[in-house]
């Protein structure tokens, strides 16, 4: 089961206040419902591939309106061939849609979210929970990027969801897709805040556990890469220094070098694996700092380059 499916399964087991049930059900019917007329009767089909969500919708309708509700199961014949669950409402459809602020008295659709549904903060959370159950998805935190989104067919409703989310300081953004619109989050901290808002506390803890391990692993990798780069740089510099010292020795001899440079050249040639700090501790006249050793080695490099260019180098 995917992380998103586990999150939704957890949400379908939450207990709610009566006002919150109405807010959640409104989002579920608005986003997953479709209307049909048969034998002069209006019916509502709410479709989902998640059995737990289908049971949730069925229970909320029965509890809230005491109506006859049918639960149908069909199998997709294409792609994954998953089961499709259809919750069918054939009684009081018009009244229920009006009560959930999905249609007006003249049966025109309400595209945004009615303020009467979300007057209380708990109801705001419940509407977002219903919206996530109906059209939401969240990446597994182990994947390369963090992403949570809620899909809506209508721009007005999508903008209303974005505004509702940002009322909780989530910094959500909207984007038009080929068949609708999404409100999305990209920041891990904001995704965990959203999971907390809608009541997915177990999913939140799992998300955070995985994120902490992942971030720690990334930090270790960055540190290792940095140390490896520094080590490669150090090795490269040491090899260059040794090559230059050999070139000077074979071309004009190390005796051409000033005493201080000759001593460092001989030490670097004889102790190729030691660090600059260790070289500084080997100098006969007393300990020299890394920067001091590095300065002398750069002078040796300069002399080697002059010799390669055909210049005459005299001992100073």
From Swiss-Prot:
Keyword Cell division part of the UniProt annotation: yes
- Which InterPro entries does this entry report, sorted A to Z? Homing_endonucl (IPR027434), Sporu_reg_WhiA_N_dom (IPR018478), Sporulation_regulator_WhiA (IPR003802), Sporulation_regulator_WhiA_C (IPR023054), WhiA_LAGLIDADG_dom (IPR039518)
State any single GO MF term: DNA binding
Instruction: Tell me the DNA-binding residue spans.
Output: 275-309
The residues that cross the membrane are: none
* A biological-process GO annotation: cell division
Keyword set, alphabetical order = Cell cycle, Cell division, DNA-binding
Q: What job does the chain carry out? A: Involved in cell division and chromosome segregation.
Protein family per UniProt: Belongs to the WhiA family.
Protein name per UniProt: Probable cell division protein WhiA
